[in-house]
């Protein structure tokens, strides 16, 4: 069971060029959350 997190954390060799993209993708929902706050601040929280 100790090898399972390692298998989930490493990409297969075929996908290694996409590693920077995979590192960025999980943060996109956080950016949408921040965008919602900026948008509401722009319209004065109607």
Curated annotation (Swiss-Prot):
Annotated TM spans: 25-45
Record keyword Transferase present: no
Alphabetical UniProt keywords: Chloroplast, Membrane, Photosynthesis, Photosystem II, Plastid, Reaction center, Thylakoid, Transmembrane, Transmembrane helix
GO biological process: photosynthesis
Pfam families: PsbK (PF02533)
Primary location class: plastid
Propeptide, chain numbering: 1-9
GO cellular component: chloroplast thylakoid membrane; photosystem II reaction center
PANTHER family named in the record: PHOTOSYSTEM II REACTION CENTER PROTEIN K, PTHR35325
Subunit and interaction comment: PSII is composed of 1 copy each of membrane proteins PsbA, PsbB, PsbC, PsbD, PsbE, PsbF, PsbH, PsbI, PsbJ, PsbK, PsbL, PsbM, PsbT, PsbX, PsbY, PsbZ, Psb30/Ycf12, at least 3 peripheral proteins of the oxygen-evolving complex and a large number of cofactors. It forms dimeric complexes.
Family, as annotated: Belongs to the PsbK family.
Protein name: Photosystem II reaction center protein K
Taxonomic source organism: Nephroselmis olivacea (Green alga)
């Amino acid at each position: 069971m100790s090898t399972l997190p390692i298998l989930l954390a490493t990409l297969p060799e075929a996908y290694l060029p996409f590693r920077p993209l995979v590192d960025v993708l999980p943060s996109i929902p956080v950016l949408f959350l921040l965008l919602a706050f900026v948008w509401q601040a722009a319209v004065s929280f109607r």
